[in-house]
Amino acid sequence: MIFLSSGLCASAQSAFEKKITAAVTQLTSTEPTNENPVTLNARILLEKDSIAVIVKVRMAPGWHVYQYVPSTMPYIPIEQILKLPEGLQAVGKWEISKPFPFANDPGVLIYERQAWFVHRVVRSAGARSGGVIQTGLYYQACDLRQCLPPVEKIFDLKVEPGN
């Protein structure tokens, strides 16, 4: 939980929020194709003891991944992966881009074209610098004709000044 005790802290927090928004916008991955319909990339943004873990995914035209699937449906929803080294602690839940209702299956939510996911992390007092954050996604990509086998893609991101 983030506690803002003064206007200065609130200003610093909103400045970090703006940096996160810019980082989400600027993060790119390779162009998806029909042969490789989903591409993703990840990075971290570091400001003092606050860290934002950012994952962005792109889908080729006509392809989608699932955000929410009712238990009666056979599709596999996306799972965000976050493994933290000692001294780092996750704060809250994943912030996610807005999914869309899937016209073919009521109750199913999907991502088309792109999606992003952000998780906040804090460094514990006295924690040493460095370490590696593992993050990524487990997902199933589908188009209107087929669903590919699920894929897990993980990135190892070094926690160091300048991220």
Which positions does each model-derived feature cover?
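Extracellular/lumen-exposed scaffold segments
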Residues: 13-163
